[in-house]
From Swiss-Prot:
<dbReference type="Pfam" id="PF00133">
    <property type="entry name" value="tRNA-synt_1"/>
</dbReference>
<comment type="subunit">
    <text>Monomer.</text>
</comment>
<dbReference type="GO" id="GO:0002161">
    <property type="term" value="F:aminoacyl-tRNA deacylase activity"/>
</dbReference>
<dbReference type="GO" id="GO:0000049">
    <property type="term" value="F:tRNA binding"/>
</dbReference>
<feature type="binding site">
    <location>
        <position position="567"/>
    </location>
    <ligand>
        <name>L-isoleucyl-5'-AMP</name>
    </ligand>
</feature>
<keyword id="KW-0862">Zinc</keyword>
<dbReference type="InterPro" id="IPR013155">
    <property type="entry name" value="M/V/L/I-tRNA-synth_anticd-bd"/>
</dbReference>
<dbReference type="InterPro" id="IPR050081">
    <property type="entry name" value="Ile-tRNA_ligase"/>
</dbReference>
<keyword id="KW-0648">Protein biosynthesis</keyword>
<dbReference type="InterPro" id="IPR010663">
    <property type="entry name" value="Znf_FPG/IleRS"/>
</dbReference>
<feature type="binding site">
    <location>
        <position position="926"/>
    </location>
    <ligand>
        <name>Zn(2+)</name>
    </ligand>
</feature>
<dbReference type="InterPro" id="IPR033708">
    <property type="entry name" value="Anticodon_Ile_BEm"/>
</dbReference>
<feature type="short sequence motif" description="'KMSKS' region">
    <location>
        <begin position="608"/>
        <end position="612"/>
    </location>
</feature>
<feature type="short sequence motif" description="'HIGH' region">
    <location>
        <begin position="58"/>
        <end position="68"/>
    </location>
</feature>
<keyword id="KW-0067">ATP-binding</keyword>
<dbReference type="GO" id="GO:0005524">
    <property type="term" value="F:ATP binding"/>
</dbReference>
<keyword id="KW-0963">Cytoplasm</keyword>
Length: 943
């Protein structure tokens, strides 16, 4: 038997079937580094329009987790796609370096007795070490960036830039010193930003407390009774017994109805609507003897239960009837609403009673409870109320309560002297910050769109921004306050610039070691040099001003503006929020044109990642087991607008999809062997109809993909590329062209036409996958035929695809119909193979019985219809002639009948043909194969 293998154009490529990503990807990273890929991208991008994505800096602490990986991969996919779209899209990664978590780590390692200078020194060293670890992990994900020159908030230039930004805000009239209740953590010993507060369930003691009347005549008059006749008290309800020592007022709603209730030995004032529930709680019976409005009770004095001072009634709209008594006890030092109401009634900062120290312990001078930790004092306060006869009831409830995000410990509101940015404070010029921010939100694009309403509601309802902290490791607030008046030095802005210049050379240490006399001279004795530091959200929130400024030629004329900020959905109250406020203060607009938000990563059951649940997916392990490209493919395939589910099983599905894409690419490459694009490529008009359709279909898909890339809809990109590989290519085109590729003459038009199409498809495909499968695209690029530069990323989207003419006979709709027919034939073949009626498709002879228009379509392919259907013979007949046993298909007007061929099998092409053995020199092959080996070669027109 003759071996005809040498006469075939068998597929051949060195592109490996097995990806070996965990081993191959690090080698690719080394290659990118050795060729200076990022620098080359900047060189070729000099004259391109710029696209700037400003990196939200991750915190320099610990290894990266799956959420970090998602964030960095999304950014990289966007910037790679923008580069391929013809933009100069640099990526400067950043790190957030100051703040409590790092200071806490240093304290845990080295103890709490460090000097402030030593603490800062160790914090800087720790942050540097953490950055190097995270940097290598980000690079391993295939993220292209200026990793040699990242921006760090602890860089001296950035620390100085932050001080200059603050100086601009002081100059603009946005900053003020105030005594206000702020979120306070005893473990941190500092105020917390809104973004550092989380809510957990907490058990608390509730108490109903009676405050005895001081102005008996006024209370009687308010209720319209001649006299009280017996002791009377107003009753409050609270979940924070520890605030009772700081009580300074009692709040009622001006429009609610309040009742004077006789319970036998005394009178109680309660909200009329709550009398029944309150008396049941107190196990008392009583009679309502009079009612009045809250308005009538204003400024009536009651007595504190155990201190010799008065508690007047103030009106407050925030009082509710959902629980309690309808009267709220008011401690202005420990509640935002309480503070606001007391200020409205004329209490000065000096009037406000604030007995709780920064560590949560009452001052020693507080009568009865001095030196006690507030939460431990709750029971002692309850006991005192029992002793004085003021406790009406106590219960234990579980409720949602604010906790420190770092220590998980309960927080309190605590009035302290802090520095604030005023949301509604009138600046030196222009609108208030709140109005500016609301307008800026309206001018910003949001992906997904719901982010706009979320950020808007946060800005509309947020309090003034407390920007000061009482920590060591942070950018200083370099203010000098007059010792007597407490006012800022009149040359504050000028002095801040002098400090910034020193910080630029020596870092924040320059301020802390500064002697006031160096800047103030003889005035130094009159001023206090403050030691507060800036909120870390101010650090990252001002990076647009001192990192991004000047880097974007398309920026707003009044300041820098990034094209895109991209972070997790928690950053609506974090970086998006602080950046918006600083941008509106400094430049009167948001520092971004568009905000993109991605969801949190959860497991396949929607649960958060947790060591206790054993469901943590670590990116480092994925890199080592499957490869970063598999993780990148999972990110692209997942709709990031909601929660993003991941697990080993989900990643395995991504690996399966990856193999299908890789195998498609390998098939394309293996059939381009011997193809030189410089000499072998055919113009579109010389290509076979099916090949022209394949290139046209690729062009249509590319248009869709570019639109999806432009809208950051990567899951659409992934699904369409995957479907193209599996369906149009793997399930149709590539299956059909195998016979032509392998059996026709190597340099025949039939084969070169097909190779031309495969080349165009490959050139497009390698670019399509480059933003997602960064490593695989780079590998594929090295194996494509023809001269080419060092990386797919040094190119733009492929422009060599051609569209079929509008009047082309075998147009898009034609091939859609042919595909449907082929699908029906394939289904019947599968049934026959399962029944063992035939061994394979090429054993089949198929007759298609079709209605008139379909007969015309099928007949256009003439004797090449069998190559499209991949059968040994294929014939077409009118539908009316279909025998009774013809199979009805899903295609309207089509039946078919398949018979097993009785003809011999060609040893070369494996078709069963009548003319096998006709040529005595080649008794084992068909006439077509004889012609392809020793004759002029077969001529194909369509497929």
């Amino acid at each position: 038997m003759t071996d005809y293998k040498a006469t075939l154009n068998l597929p051949d490529t060195a592109f490996p079937m097995k990806a070996g990503l965990p081993q191959r990807e690090p080698q690719t990273l080394q290659r990118w580094d050795s060729i200076g890929l990022y620098q080359k991208l900047r060189e070729i991008g000099k004259d391109r329009p710029k696209f700037v994505l400003h990196d939200g800096p991750p915190y320099a602490n610990g290894n990266i987790h799956i959420g970090h990986a998602v964030n960095k991969i999304l950014k990289d996919m966007i910037l790679r796609s923008k580069t391929l779209a013809g933009f100069d899209a640099p990526y400067v990664p950043g790190w957030d370096c100051h703040g409590l978590p790092i200071e806490h780590k240093v304290e845990v390692t080295h103890g709490k007795n460090l000097s402030a200078d030593r603490t800062r020194e160790l914090c800087r060293a720790y942050a540097s070490e953490q950055i190097e670890g995270q940097k290598s992990e980000f690079i391993r994900l295939g993220v292209l960036g200026d990793w040699s020159n990242p921006y760090l908030t602890m860089n001296f230039a950035n620390e100085a830039g932050e001080i200059r930004a603050l100086a601009e805000m002081v100059k603009g009239g946005f900053v003020f010193k105030g005594l206000k209740p702020v979120n306070w953590c005893f473990d941190c010993g500092s105020a917390l930003a809104e973004a550092e507060v989380e809510y957990q369930d907490k058990k608390s003691s509730t108490i109903d407390v009676a405050f005895p009347i001081a102005d008996e005549a006024k209370l009687a008059a308010a209720f319209g009774v001649p006299s009280l006749g017996k002791p009377a008290s107003i009753v409050i309800w609270t979940t924070t017994p520890w605030t009772i020592p700081a009580n300074q007022a009692l709040n009622v709603h001006p429009e609610f109805e309040y009742a004077l209730v006789d319970v036998g030995d005394k009178l109680l004032v309660l909200a009329a609507e709550l009398v029944e529930s309150c008396l049941a709680r107190y196990k008392l019976e009583g009679t309502v003897i009079a009612t009045t409005t809250g308005q009538a009770l204003e400024l009536i004095n009651f007595r504190h239960p155990f201190y010799d001072r008065l508690s007047p009634v103030y009106l407050a709209d925030y009082v509710e009837l959902g629980a309690g008594t309808g009267i709220v006890h008011c401690s202005p030092a420990y509640g935002v609403d309480d503070f606001t109401i007391c200020k409205q009634y004329g209490l000065s900062n000096d009037d406000i009673i604030s007995p709780v120290q920064s560590n949560g312990v009452y001052v020693e001078s507080l009568e009865f409870f001095g030196g006690q930790f507030i939460f431990k004092a709750n029971q002692n306060i309850i006991d005192k109320l029992v002793e004085v006869g003021s406790l009406m009831d106590t219960e234990t409830i579980s409720h949602s309560y604010m906790h420190c995000w770092r220590h998980k410990s309960p927080l309190i509101y605590r009035a302290t002297a802090q520095w604030f940015v005023g949301m509604d404070k009138q600046p030196e010029s222009g609108e208030t910050l709140r109005k500016r921010a609301v307008k800026a939100i309206e001018d910003t694009e949001f992906v997904p769109a719901w982010g706009q309403a979320r950020l808007h509601s946060m800005i509309a309802n947020r309090p003034d921004w407390c920007i000061s902290r009482q920590r060591n490791w942070g950018v200083p607030i370099p203010f000098f306050l007059h010792k007597e008046s407490g006012d800022l030095h009149p040359r504050t802005v000028e002095l801040m610039e002098e400090v910034a210049q020193r910080v630029e050379k020596e870092g924040i240490e320059a301020w802390f070691k500064l002697d006031a006399s160096e800047l103030l001279g003889d005035e130094a004795g009159k001023y206090d040099k403050i030691s507060d530091t800036l909120d870390v959200w101010f650090d990252s929130g001002t990076t647009h001003w001192h990192v991004l400024r000047g880097s974007h030629p398309m920026g707003h004329e009044s300041g820098p503006r990034a094209d895109l900020y991209l972070e997790g959905s928690d950053q609506h109250r974090g970086w998006f929020h602080s950046s918006l406020l600083t941008g509106c203060m400094l430049d009167d607009h948001a520092p971004y044109r568009e905000l993109l938000t991605h969801g949190f990563v959860v497991d396949e059951n929607g649960r958060k990642m947790s060591k206790s649940l054993n469901n943590v997916v670590a990116p480092q392990k994925v890199n080592d087991s499957l490869g970063a490209d598999i993780m990148r493919l999972w990110v692209s395939a997942t709709d990031y607008s909601g929660e993003m589910a991941v697990s080993d099983q989900i990643l395995q599905r991504s690996a399966d999809a990856y193999r299908r894409i890789r195998n498609t690419a390998r098939f394309l490459l293996s059939n381009l062997t011997g193809f030189n694009p410089a000499t072998d490529i055919l113009p579109a008009e010389e290509m076979l109809a099916l090949d022209r359709w394949a290139v046209d279909r690729t062009l249509l898909l590319q248009r869709e993909l570019l639109e999806h890339y432009g809208e950051y809809r990567f899951w659409n990109v992934y699904s369409k590329i995957h479907n193209f590989c599996v369906q149009e290519l793997g399930g149709f085109y590539l299956d059909i062209i195998k016979d032509r590729q392998y059996t026709t003459a190597a340099n025949s038009t039939a084969r070169r036409s097909c190779q031309t199409a495969l080349f165009h498809i490959s050139e497009a495909l390698v670019r399509w996958i480059a933003p997602i499968l960064a490593f695989t695209a780079d590998e594929l690029w090295q194996f494509l035929p023809g001269e080419r530069n060092e990386s797919v990323m040094l190119n733009t989207w492929y422009d060599g695809l051609t569209e079929m003419p509008a009047d082309f006979d075998m147009d898009r709709a034609y091939w859609e119909r042919i595909m449907a027919v082929k699908t029906s034939v394939n289904k019947e073949m599968e049934n026959l193979r399962a029944a063992k009626a035939i061994g394979g498709n090429l054993q089949a002879e198929v007759t298609l019985y079709a209605e008139e228009s379909l007969v015309a379509d099928l007949s256009k392919l003439s004797n090449e219809l069998r190559f499209v259907l991949i059968t040994s013979t294929a014939s077409v007949a009118p539908l009316a002639s279909a025998p009774a046993d013809a199979v009805v298909t899903e295609v309207a007007g089509l039946k078919l009948k398949v018979l097993k061929s009785s003809h011999a099998k060609c040893a070369r092409c494996w078709h069963h043909r009548e003319d096998v053995g006709v040529n005595p020199e080649h008794p084992e092959i068909c006439g077509r194969c004889v012609d392809n080996i020793s004759g002029a070669g077969e001529v194909r027109h369509y497929a």
